[in-house]
Design a protein with these regions (language model features):
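A substrate-binding/cap region within the structured catalytic cores of diverse enzymes
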Residues: 19, 70, 77
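Short charge-dense sequence patches
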Residues: 2-5, 66, 78-85
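Conserved SGNH/GDSL esterase-like catalytic core that processes O-acyl groups on lipids
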Residues: 1-53
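Catalytic His-Asp segment of secreted/periplasmic serine-dependent ester chemistry enzymes
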Residues: 75-180
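Sec-exported extracytoplasmic/periplasmic mature domains
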Residues: 29, 49, 53-61, 132, ...
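Extracellular/periplasmic catalytic domains that process cell-envelope and extracellular macromolecules
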Residues: 15-20, 58-60, 140-142, 149
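Surface-exposed, flexible loop/turn segments at secondary-structure boundaries
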Residues: 32, 73-76
Length: 180
């Protein structure tokens, strides 16, 4: 989630005077909406500003940041839900099992509860609006930046137009992460 991303970013140790410029990619995917009520927009805003401000204190001048928004994870349910998991059950049942035993990777998207999935997607899109607000007003001294929406739909459409099955883009083991 965005709060933990700040902790991870602090592991980056750079010398602003002697190091060459960096290309930093920041992608939160769905972590801010995966569990419980998710990160509230105002907390998300504070977390992202905190990350951006901190990066400006460590990135060498001339660095670049590419930010990618949160994914609309409802697409996972659409692609995977009724397909069969390698354990022999539909992915929806597999997701519910993981929720039941408390080891789900993203309980708000990986579920058979369509209402919960739709609510989670709406929360993710609301956080993407916060991203848009931040990046339309933010200025950094040591790096420039660009922000993109998470291109899941485009990737899936492109894959399908080339004859691929969208099911093959997602790991068949966890039913969530991109397949390798």
């Amino acid at each position: 989630a965005s709060g933990g991303t700040f902790d991870n970013a602090q592991l980056m140790n750079r010398n602003q005077t002697t190091d060459k410029p960096l290309l930093v990619i920041m992608e939160l995917a769905a972590n801010d909406v995966c569990f419980g009520q998710g990160t509230q927009p105002e907390d998300f805003r504070k977390n992202i500003y905190r990350i951006l401000d901190w990066l400006d204190t460590v990135l060498p001048p001339g660095s670049h940041l590419v930010s990618i928004g949160l994914v609309n994870g409802s697409i996972i349910h659409e692609i995977m839900g009724t397909k069969t998991h390698p354990m022999g059950m539909p992915f929806n049942d597999f997701y519910d099992y993981l929720n039941c035993v408390g080891v789900d990777l993203c309980e708000n998207y990986l579920t058979s509860n369509v209402t919960k999935i739709q609510e989670t997607a709406a929360k993710a899109m609301a956080l993407n609006k916060v991203y848009e607000e931040i990046f339309s007003n933010y200025t950094a001294k040591n790096y420039d930046f660009v922000h993109y929406d998470f291109p899941a739909e485009w990737i899936i459409e492109k894959w399908a137009s080339q004859g691929g099955d969208p099911f093959d883009l997602i790991s068949h083991v966890d039913g969530f992460h991109p397949s390798q």
